[in-house]
Amino acid sequence: MVLYSVVLAVIIFLPVPFLFKAEKVSLLAPQSFSMFVLGEAFMLIETKCCTELSLQFGNTWVVSSVVIFSFLTLSFLANLLVLRLDDRRLHSLMPAVYGLLTLVLLLNFFLSAQAIALPAAGAKAITTFISCLPVFFCGIIFSSHFKRATDPNMALAANLLGVTFGGLLENLCVVGGVKSLSLISLLLYLLSALPLLRKGAVSAEVADAKP
């Protein structure tokens, strides 16, 4: 069990040292690092949402269809919002988006239908909404990172590679339960913000250096 956990931890943090790699077109460049961990995190959120809703409503094609429809709708709305915002407003909005995503994922972890003082149908509706809501904020984060990418092909390659590793990370639910995927995906999404912080620091240094 210890070896299993160590290997999965290595998979999560493997791309971190490459954050400061200089080549901007490399698969290991900062922009690709963000896309990589975004792919990992989204895979975990998708797995958690599908699993929890299947446990609540039954593992049927109707439940799977509702989950897929919800994901596509929320992703579309997120992309629509990003398209309507200019780069400056989008950049200023990112701290709020990361903050709301953190709040929703923590609610996902701590909240359960049994803890809500409502009839079973209402409690399940609320937990379903909270389970799917992170996709909206995830879509905004993904689109904003992709919008900044200097090489879209490399960014998508890194994202797909992250999805592959995310498929491996799904096995962590064997150790910590399905709800633990919320915390792991939150960690990965916060890691995706590191290049943004680094970029902001570099921009501030350049601005200070100007006469």
Residue ranges, per PLM feature:
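Alpha-helical transmembrane segments of multi-pass membrane proteins
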Residues: 1-211
